[in-house]
């Protein structure tokens, strides 16, 4: 299911469904495929990589968060589970006793009781069980049509005259954890029901991208955290020569679509944004450098150098009209997705052209019709 070798899918013109934050409600993917006619799915985490045994590994705080935002749990049951009188032990007991999934539907897909209608390419999010991901990476767990995109596993999708190259980086971005793998046993990091990105993963992704580079491909960086908020991800997108970034993690009611040229006054402001990210990383790096360099293997040292190369990847101060950094500044497009329960993005690909369509349930403003104070002449502006 998941290997270092590139995965390839070839399909005629069609739609790519992009969603985020299923939070274990995996059946929603099939419903969305029926609604949109999508040929495949890109997912940005949180996917819901939890099994029944995960309950023993999740911290009380994370468990409460999962219950609060799960779309698997009926509202009345959620209200009962989150009552102040419910202790952490009682909450765990009720989840364990439930005959229907509360944490995730993943076990139903592992046993074959449920299946995915189309190929799904996903990264993991910030709330996942690292032990479950380790089982997928080792091959102990497999689900037909589920492909995990990470620092060493990439995919190519030949669709509608375009070759999409998918790169992925899952987990939260936490500066103080970039050199901590937590309970992970390989290169991925996590613990207590959460996962985060490490510096070595960033370095490995750069290595993977270099090995498979093909100028005829259209490159997409899929991440859980947003490159718009995390400068190191914006630097990574530049390093990978990404044409698109697709991310999640902000939980807005509407999707976001932008390029840096559209939101920055000039390229120098963009450079300053990345320079701040560089400084934050280097300040942290100076504190751990001696310890890390004394304990990494030769192979890890190469990956570490790759990561430092990303951190030091800043656009030039003065650029020529055809400079590659200026091209990225104007042409690299960024999408941040709402939760799957709130909206989606469709890439409609045909004859080499990638069209986009966004859908959102949006905000409900009907309450304003009943706002007596505004109707009676209150100021329209603050």
Where are these regions (language model features)?
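Active-site neighborhood of phospho(di)ester-bond hydrolases with catalytic His/Asp-centered motifs
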Residues: 18-20, 41-46, 76-80, 92-101, ...
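Short coil/turn segments at secondary-structure boundaries
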Residues: 29-33, 54-57, 134-138, 179-182, ...
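Active-site-proximal loop/helix segment associated with metal-binding centers of metalloenzymes
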Residues: 65-91, 158-220, 363, 370-377
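Conserved beta-sheet core of the metallophosphoesterase superfamily
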Residues: 119-121, 220, 225-351, 355
């Amino acid at each position: 299911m998941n290997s270092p070798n590139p995965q390839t899918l070839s399909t005629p013109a069609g739609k790519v469904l992009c969603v985020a934050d299923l939070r274990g409600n995996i059946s929603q993917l099939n419903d969305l495929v029926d609604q949109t006619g999508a040929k495949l799915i890109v997912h940005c985490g949180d996917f819901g990589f939890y099994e029944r045994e995960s309950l023993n590994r999740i911290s009380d705080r994370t468990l409460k968060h999962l219950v609060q935002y799960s779309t698997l749990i009926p509202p009345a049951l959620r209200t009962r589970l989150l009552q102040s009188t419910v202790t952490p032990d009682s909450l765990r007991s009720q989840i364990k006793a439930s005959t229907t999934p509360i944490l995730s539907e993943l076990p139903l897909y592992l046993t074959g009781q449920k299946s995915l209608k189309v190929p799904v390419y996903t990264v993991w999010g910030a709330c996942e069980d690292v032990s479950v991901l380790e089982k997928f990476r080792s091959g102990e767990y497999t689900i037909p049509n589920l492909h995990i995109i990470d620092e060493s596993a990439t995919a190519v999708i030949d669709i509608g005259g375009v070759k999409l190259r998918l790169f992925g980086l899952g987990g939260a971005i936490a500066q103080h954890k970039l050199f901590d793998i937590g309970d992970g046993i390989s290169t991925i990091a996590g613990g207590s029901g959460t996962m985060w990105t490490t510096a070595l993963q960033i370095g490995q992704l750069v290595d993977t991208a270099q090995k498979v580079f093909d100028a005829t491909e259209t490159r997409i960086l899929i991440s859980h955290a947003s490159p718009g908020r995390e400068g190191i991800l914006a630097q990574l997108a530049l390093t990978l020569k990404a044409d698109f970034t697709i991310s999640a993690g902000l939980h807005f009611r509407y999707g976001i679509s932008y390029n840096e040229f559209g939101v920055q006054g000039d390229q120098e402001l963009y450079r300053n944004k990345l320079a701040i990210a560089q400084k934050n990383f280097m300040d942290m790096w100076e504190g751990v450098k001696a310890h890390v360099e004394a304990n990494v293997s030769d192979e890890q040292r190469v990956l570490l150098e790759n990561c430092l190369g990303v951190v030091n990847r800043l656009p030039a101060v003065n650029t020529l009209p055809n400079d590659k950094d200026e091209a990225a500044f104007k042409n690299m497009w960024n999408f941040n997705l709402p939760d799957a329960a709130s909206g989606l993005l469709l890439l409609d690909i045909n004859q080499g052209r990638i069209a986009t369509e966004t859908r959102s349930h949006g905000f409900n403003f009907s309450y304003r019709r009943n706002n007596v104070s505004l109707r009676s002449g209150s100021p329209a502006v603050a």
